[in-house]
Structures are given as structure tokens and as C-alpha cells.
Amino acid sequence: MKYSFIRYAADNFAEVFYITKIKKKMVNLFQYNTRRLFIFINRKIITFLFTLLIIPCFFSCDSSNYNQQISVDGLQEPVEILRDQWGINHIYAKNQHDLFFAQGYAAAKDRLFQFEIWRRQATGTVAEILGEKELKRDIGTRLFKFRGDLTQELNHYHEDGVEIITAYTNGVNAYIEEVLGTPDQLPIEFKLLNIVPEKWTPDVVISRHQGLLGNIGEELRIGRAVAKLGVKTVKDLSWFHPKDPDINLDPSIDKDLLFDDILELYNAYRKVVRFQDSDIQPEYRTSENVNALLVLNEGKDDPFSIGSNNWVVSGALMADGNTYMANDPHRTIAVPSLRYMTHLVAPGWNVIGGGEPEIPGVSIGHNEYGSWGLTVFRTDGEDMYIYNLNPNNSNQYKYNGEWVNMTIISETIKVKGKDDISVDLKYTKHGPVTYVDKVHNIAYAIRCAWLEPGGSPYLASLRMDQSKTWEEFREACNYSHIPGENMIWADKEGNIGWQAVGIAPIRTNFSGLVPVPGDGRYEWDGYLPINEKPNTLNPPEGFFATANQNVTPNDYKRWNAIGFSWSDPYRGDRVNEVLGSAKKITMDDMKALQVDYLSIPARILIPLLDGLSFAGKSAEAKNKLNGWDYKLEPNSIEAAIYVAFENQIRLLANHKFIPETGKDFITSIQMKKLLDWIITPDDRFGSNPILGRDQFLSKAFNKGIKYLEETLGDDLNNWQYGQEKFKHTYMAHALGKFVNEETKAKLDIGPLPRGGNAYTPGSTGGNNRQSSGASFRMIVNTGNWDDAVSTNGPGQSGNPESPFYSNLFEPWAKDQYFPVYYSRIKIDSVTVNKTLLNPKK
């Protein structure tokens, strides 16, 4: 007899546990016959009910059932890891410690090179392997290191945070010890760079270096743009909403000094690791002369191209009557995938989904009660402060009329091929000092809400992973500080909800969109309690969707604690359009919406061509658009014509409307702003706005057609969207460009055709080669957990030798899904490898 799960849950004065029995059927299928036994026992009398009431037969009594058994130092009891055919590890442990130990072990085994680079980024030790070119990064990393109480920090993310995170890093280290015993088993990247992995500590897990942290780069760009162009012009070219922010620079700020490299250390800390051919061992190096650099992990996304979609739908709109959750976070398309999927099962835990590879838990997924997902909710958690320094002591700054000493911390950094370098890290009361102008006695520091306890991105998902109700989920959301997110929830009781999260400074007398003096006049008035951020439960529409656009209700009162800059609304508009008109929605409908390529901008722009005259190839192309459905599908000629047209509109608009002196600071105009101008033209198009607008569109269309002719030839039939020359995906490994062809073939993946663009729900940003979008997607049916589906391209593993390195690339590129099984019987049916981890005796 097998028991599917034993749940131990401690409530305030009671222990509640649910026992679910599996009954065998004649055709070797199992149905759940669930009985809930509620036993209420005063916690003051019994503080601990059981360690194992019944050992669930997750563990086979026959050792021959396992592909391998491994003895691991640090485990308390055996742990079973079942790997399914898509590469997901289903981890079954008998206690919480072993569960997260095994998660760390398995994740490190799959992503060891990614883990080692992450560790070096997190600890400021990249220069130790890549030399002096990475010194600024290491200084920045140490400057922005969390230096608060570690126990308080770890327990912020979960009441057992110290145990969970320490167990996770010990699991990582157990695998590192194991593989160092057989170094020939190290992934090839270690051989290419001639390095070995080193041990982790909890400090690595809580690093903030690659989180979506705030807007400090935008803040400085706006400040510089105001200095060059003035407030009126900057506001005209920007799309600030829903309120009108004050972006005036304080009169005491010397505008000319804003153009120094103020954020050099911050940007170095935040940027991805860049390799050069000289980093590669000679025997693997390409013979070509390579000057270009490639990146590892995630590129620096444009603030408004970072996107995601999620939505929850009530059972009233679904054909089967169940609530559903769908989520597809959009980030840089990379190898390995930015998300890592896992299934964690132990007393008190049964959660499955995707998360950041380097942290414990699951950030997008479901447990046996509900499902949740996330998108970015614009929250400004950073500000730049400018200080006057004491001419007689550059380590003192003026604050509230007095000279105040900076805090100084000395660090020593190892640099490959050089002597160790000592640096002094300086801090004001607001935060790290990133730049000192010694000539003008000016210093700049960044106040970062994410340096408060709880600033590690996504790690508070640990609390969400055990939520049983909407109320418990909202309580867990209170601990989710970074990034600002739209958290959605759907549960099997029929509830759907939305809660915006993220640590949000309250600014009472400034907007946070431009630098301010650090003299005491511009201070934060605490932080907005997260449960006071916008939220809703069971909206009357029967669904709720977010796509990084502003979804804050108009009657919301706390505008001084949320952002003024949001993504274009078109992805969200399309999702709302489909869900708002649908009845009896199915899982197939949900899949189709996640990869929907209908372009609302196309639906706006193409009809405006009707009254315009064209000749030659442009006329032929315009006629081709008659009756088009506005979908940017692969192999579509119409899609190719439109995208070439749209690209030229943006290029011409940037050239025409952004003054030359501001082009370095305002690099583009948001599509929503631009389309508003085009729909209702004014004198920016000339004395006859409609004629000027039409001439602008004609020029853009002709230039788009010329581009297609030059790129794809004269034959219109060859102008197909979704090909290597025009919209494809190619996942280039960070080292691929610098190695010989044999090695490169192992590392790089692709190309394959893609559809869509940055403004379609099926988002594929990045012009001709997709560079951003949803490499991970998940849809959950709360009435049947085994009905969940997902995709995670290019694969679960980061090891090029693994069969799970690129097995999901083609299905992902073709917008296909695989099942994410939850029940043991279903998981057993697709298991391809069974590992038993035993405590080392």
C-alpha cells in the first residue's frame, strides 16, 4: 500500500494533518479517495507530534529499483530523487532538512558552472579568475554587500530560514566535494577556463546582484535629460503615469556634474560576466580573431522590455469549473535557462514549479492547495543622493547642517596575475558611495531598499510554497521585498486573487525620478506595508491579468509609494480582450493565449495606410496586408512586412522627435506614447498634422520595404517572418564564440524560427534575433494538479554533456508544452532515472 503524502501542519493552537489514501483500480490506475482527518491538539501540551507517523512508500524496499545509490555526508535519512523524461527532479525526503539539502545537491549537479559564476559574482571574487578587467565588479559587489545580521536575514524568508538555506548550501557543497573527487566529471566550462568550483555559504544565496532591483539607472538618465532638455521636453517624450511626477532638479544641484561616471561601481556590480578569448585555455581556443564579447546568464534588460504575463481565471469562466493560473515571466533568453524546475516533497512540503536555480524553494508553481505566479510591478526602491564634502576632510559630508563621518570598510581583493589590491568602501547614512568628485568636493551615494533585511530576490517564495489559503498567501507576500511583483493566486476552493508586493519607500516631498541632495531634506518616510499595496480577491470579471502595465485602481491612495514608469499596455490589453470575451475556456485556450501573436499596434497602424498611395514593391506589399489578421506568426509574409514597418516607425520617431542633445539619455519613445501621437496627430507633425503624420507613415513603410528587399531579396514570397535573417532564436553560450568549432557545437543551441515581438502576449523581444521573452511558462488547473503544463527552454541542465541540456529547446521554440505531473503514480510513469541518496556512515 502506498500513501501519496503525509501532511504535517502546525497552526496557532492546533495540529492539522490530512491523510490521502490511494485506492487501486483493476486497470492499474489509481484514484484518490480523500478523507480529511482533523485532529486539534493544544500546542502547549504537545509541541511535536511526530517525525514520521507513517513512512510514505516514496522509497522502494528493493534497492535494485534505483539507477544509482550515492552516500552523501550531511544527510539525516535517505532521499529519493526521480528524474522525469523532461528533466524535472522530483525529490522525496523524510524531513525538511534533507529536502533542501537534496535540492541544493541536485541543482548544483545540473547547473554547476552557472553556480560557480554566481558564487563569484555574489562574493566579489571574479577578478581572481578573470583578472583586472573584473576588478570594478568585485569592488561594486563588496560595496553593495548585505552586512546586516545574517540570522535575522535568513529567517526573514522563512521561520526556519537558517535551517533551510544552510541545508541547501550544504547540499551544494556535498555535490562539489563529490565531483572534485572525480574532476574529469566537471562540466566542460571548467576545463575551458581552467578553474574548479568552490564551496558555498548562505551569503551566496542572499546576494542581490542579479535581482530586478530598482530604477537608479533610469533616475540618473532622467536627471541628465532634464539637465540637457528641461522638464517640459522630458515629460513630453516620456510616458509617466498614472500620476504626473515632479522631475525638477533641486536648485542646489550642479547639473554639469551629473555627467560623470557616477554609477560605474553600481553598473559593474550589476552587469553580467563578460568573457574574452584570452580567458580560454589555448587548446580549446578558436583560431579566429574574436573581439566581440558574449555574456553569461542575463543581459541588462531595458527597463521597459523586462516583462511577463500572468493571469488567474475563476471556475465560472472555465469549461471544467476549476480555477486556473497561468504565468510566463519574460527575461533574457539564455543558456542555461534562467528558471529551474523542481518538485519538493517532505512532511509539510509538496510544491512543484520553477524558480531561480541558485536559491531553495519554488517561486512559480503550486502546492496541494493553490497555485501562484508573478510579473514585475513597478516599484522604485532606489534613490541617488548628492553630498557636499568637507574641503578639509573628504570622508565627511554635510547632513542637517553638520559634518558627518562616512563609515569606511577596508577589503582586500585577489586579482589574477596581480598583487592583492586593498580598497576602502565608503558609506553615508543613506548607503554606498559610488563616486567621489575630488575636484568639486561632491560625493554620490545610493539608498537601496533592497539592502534592508529581506532583499534577496524571490527567496521569500519559501513562505508562499506552504500557503494553504488566500489569507496565508497574502501573509507570505508580506515578506516578498524584491522584486516588486504582481503576485497572483488561484486555489482549489474556487478563489482567485492578486496582491502587489515589493518593498516600497514612501516619499512625501519628491518623486524619486531624479537625483536629490543628501543634506536631510529628501528622506523616506518609512516603507508602505506590503498588504497595503494594491490587491483584489475574486474580481467580478472572473479573471485578473497583469503584464507589467499599470493595473492600480484609480481610487488607490498610496501613489507616493509605487512607480510612475510602466510597460506598454498592449500585451495586457490583448490578454484582457481574450479573457473578457471568452466563455467555457479550456486548457488549450490558456496555452494559445500564452503564445498569442496578435499585435494590437499592428491593428492600430495598418488601417492608417488605407488612404496612402504607394508604388512598386511598396504597393505590392501594402496589398498583401489586405485582410491580414494582425498575427505575427512564423512563416507569415504579412508579419514580416508589418514588423519592418513598425521598426522603421520607431527609428524615424527617435530621429525626428528626440533632440540631438538628449539622445544619449532618452534613447527611444515608448510605443504607447508614439501611437497616441500617431492616432491624434498635433503640430509636432507640422502645420498640417494629418498630412505630416501620413507622410511620416509613408516614409516608414517605404523604408521598411527597402529593408526587406536588401535583406531577403526582391521576391515577396521570401519575405517570411521567422527565419534566420528575420526573427529567429539562437542561444549562444557565453563561451561559444571563443572556442573551436567542435566545442562550440556542444555549447550553442539553434537557430530556430520564432514569431511575435515585444508587444504580443507571446513576447519575443530583441529585433531579428530574439533576446528576451518567456523561456519558462506554466499553466495550472487547480482541480487536477496532474493537468499542469510547462515549458523551460532550452533545458533543465546547464551541462552541455547532459541529455537535458537542450532537449526542451525545439518544443519551446515551437510553443509546445509538456505535462508537469504531481501525483506519484503519474511521476513514476514518466521517470527515466531514480537515485537514492543515503547518509554516509
Outline where the language-model segments fall.
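N-terminal secretory signal peptides that target proteins for export/translocation
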Residues: 1-42
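C-terminal motif of bacterial Sec signal peptides marking the signal peptidase cleavage site
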Residues: 58-60
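Substrate-recognition/specificity elements adjacent to catalytic centers across diverse enzyme folds
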Residues: 65-324, 329-332
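Second-shell loop/turn segments in exported
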Residues: 100-102, 149-162, 447, 458-464, ...
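Glycine- and hydrophobic-rich flexible loops that cap the catalytic core of alpha/beta enzyme folds
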Residues: 346, 351-356, 365-369, 374-518
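Hydrophobic alpha-helical segments
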Residues: 382, 442, 482-582, 649
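Terminal end segments
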Residues: 561, 565-618, 703-841
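Charged, long alpha-helical assembly modules
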Residues: 645-725
